[in-house]
């Protein structure tokens, strides 16, 4: 019985998992920069377009809360921004 419960919990944790992080521009691994004086105005809509729950400006970049696993975040492909 315990094994069935553990397997069920592992399956549910995969289905309902989400994560927080800095979303990146496609193909560049560069964060979306923002103005910290406008904490929510730019980042919340940007994050919601990526199916996150919300987002805000943190350390001059958009931080999203509740991103789906398939959305790339800063650090997934290394830590360097490859612009241009």
From Swiss-Prot:
It comes from the Eukaryota. This is Toxin Acra3. Has the structural arrangement of an alpha-helix connected to antiparallel beta-sheets by disulfide bonds (CS-alpha/beta). Expressed by the venom gland. Belongs to the long (4 C-C) scorpion toxin superfamily. Sodium channel inhibitor family. Beta subfamily. Disulfide bonds join 30-81, 34-57, 43-62, 47-64. InterPro entries: LCN-type_CS_alpha_beta_dom, Scorpion_toxin-like, Scorpion_toxin-like_sf, Scorpion_toxinL, Scorpion_toxinL/defensin. GO terms for molecular function: sodium channel inhibitor activity; toxin activity. One of its GO terms (cellular component) is extracellular region. The modification Serine amide is found at residue 83. Keywords: Amidation, Disulfide bond, Ion channel impairing toxin, Neurotoxin, Secreted, Signal, Toxin. Residues 19-82 form the LCN-type CS-alpha/beta domain. It is found in: Secreted. It comes from Androctonus crassicauda. Its main location: secreted. Negative results: does not inhibit Nav1.1/SCN1A, Nav1.2/SCN2A, Nav1.3/SCN3A, Nav1.4/SCN4A, Nav1.5/SCN5A, and Nav1.6/SCN8A voltage-gated sodium channels. Does not show toxicity in insects and crustaceans. Pfam families: Toxin_3. Residues 1-17 form the signal peptide. The keyword Secreted applies. GO terms for biological process: defense response. Toxin with unknown target. In vivo, induces severe neurotoxic events in mice such as excitability and convulsions, leading to the death of the animals within a few minutes after injection. Exerts very strong cytotoxic effect on a mouse brain tumor cell line (BC3H1) (IC(50)=5 mg/ml). It exerts its effects by inducing a stronger necrosis than apoptosis in BC3H1 cells.
């Amino acid at each position: 019985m315990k094994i069935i419960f553990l397997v069920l919990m592992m399956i549910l944790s995969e289905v309902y998992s989400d994560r927080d992080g800095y979303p990146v521009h496609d193909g560049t691994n560069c964060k979306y920069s923002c103005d910290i004086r406008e904490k929510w105005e730019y980042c919340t809509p940007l994050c919601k377009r990526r199916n996150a729950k919300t987002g805000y400006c943190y350390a001059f970049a958009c931080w999203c809360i509740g991103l789906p696993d398939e959305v790339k975040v800063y650090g997934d492909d290394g830590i360097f921004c490859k612009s241009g």
